[in-house]
Curated annotation (Swiss-Prot):
Belongs to the UPF0149 family. One of its GO terms (cellular component) is cytosol. It comes from Pseudomonas paraeruginosa (strain DSM 24068 / PA7). InterPro entries: YgfB-like, YgfB-like_sf. This is UPF0149 protein PSPA7_5968.
Length: 184
């Protein structure tokens, strides 16, 4: 499965309860962008970045959910997966709303990536991925609600599941392996 539908619904509810104008897709994209740019998986740094994005410190339940989101992303990168899981609405959601969420995910990713300090310049391939994401962020509402529109959406979503891995390989901080037990 390429999306986390129940997680998306849960985050939507938490964000709506707190009257926050950020979508779950944008929040997840922001986290992945930070991680791929080299911010690593530090819990405190992520909570601080999320608080800035949300416009203030999150409540206890949202803070716990943000921690869980970080754990989900960490798992994607530590399991050696060939694609990441995107936090997007389920396939039953109208295409226009799913396309809007995909654009929000890209906007969040670009913001998270851009706000993270990194050394050196990017390869042409990495720059192309970021340009693709910027273009995808602009397509909101432009896909037809048809079989062709669904196919286009799925192709773009699959591309976005793989593209972050290229950026992570180039800029990301590798996960530190768990310490090996010592024998005494």
């Amino acid at each position: 499965m390429s999306t986390q539908n129940s997680a998306y619904s849960a985050f939507s509810s938490l964000l709506a309860e707190a009257a926050l104008p950020v979508s779950p897709a944008e929040l997840h994209g922001h986290l992945l962008g930070r991680v791929c740019a080299g911010a690593g998986f530090d819990e405190a740094a992520w909570q601080h970045a999320a608080a800035e994005l949300l416009g203030g410190a999150p409540g206890e339940r949202l803070e716990a959910a943000l921690s869980g989101l970080l754990g989900m992303v960490r798992q994607d990168f530590s399991a050696g997966e060939v694609a990441v899981v995107l936090l997007l609405p389920d396939d039953e959601t109208p295409l226009a709303q799913r396309t809007e969420a995909l654009g929000q995910w890209c906007q969040g990713f670009l913001a998270g990536f851009g706000l993270t300090a990194r050394e050196g310049s990017l390869t042409g391939e990495a720059e192309e991925v970021l340009q693709d994401m910027a273009a995808i962020a602009q397509v909101q509402g432009q896909l037809e609600d048809s079989e062709d529109g669904e196919t286009d959406y799925m192709e773009v979503m699959e591309y976005l599941r793989v593209a972050p891995l290229l950026l992570f390989a180039e800029c990301g901080k590798p996960l530190e392996p768990a310490p090996k037990p010592s024998l005494h």
